């Protein structure tokens, strides 16, 4: 049973890609683009993102959407990327031979990419939205004429 301060648990699914051979900083840059977006829109953003990491993040997001659709029976059009984060994986250490017997260390960094999608309930129209939908008040021609006459 949820506690007093707990938010209601929404249905959703997650997908994790582990030991991805991309620098965590570069992957985080791509993940930050899609966090909070609707899932279908996030796929489109990733499809046209120029970063190399966007391909891996696209695969993880597509897997999370498929998990939600197949395991949780959720509508893929009603999904939102609620969480998306990148953790650092193990670093493979290599060396580059240099002149005069030296060797420089090369760090081949890996990361773990996690994407969580949740179903969102359709938002009820609020009072502010209904005010925007109301037509603007029209002024009568007589009222505008009297204002212009006084200005002359």
From Swiss-Prot:
Source organism, top-level taxon: Bacteria
Pfam family, one: Ribosomal_L22
Bias type Low complexity, positions: 124-143
CC per GO annotation: cytosolic large ribosomal subunit
Residue ranges of the region described as Disordered: 124-152
Keyword tags: Ribonucleoprotein, Ribosomal protein, RNA-binding, rRNA-binding
One Gene Ontology term of the molecular function aspect: rRNA binding
Keyword Zinc-finger among UniProt keywords: no
Annotated InterPro entries: Ribosomal_uL22, Ribosomal_uL22_bac/chlpt-type, Ribosomal_uL22_bac/org-type, Ribosomal_uL22_CS, Ribosomal_uL22_sf
GO biological process terms held by the UniProt record: translation
Subunit structure: Part of the 50S ribosomal subunit.
Record-linked NCBIfam families: rplV_bact
Family: Belongs to the universal ribosomal protein uL22 family.
Role: This protein binds specifically to 23S rRNA; its binding is stimulated by other ribosomal proteins, e.g. L4, L17, and L20. It is important during the early stages of 50S assembly. It makes multiple contacts with different domains of the 23S rRNA in the assembled 50S subunit and ribosome.
Name of the protein described by the UniProt record: Large ribosomal subunit protein uL22
Organism: Salinispora arenicola (strain CNS-205)
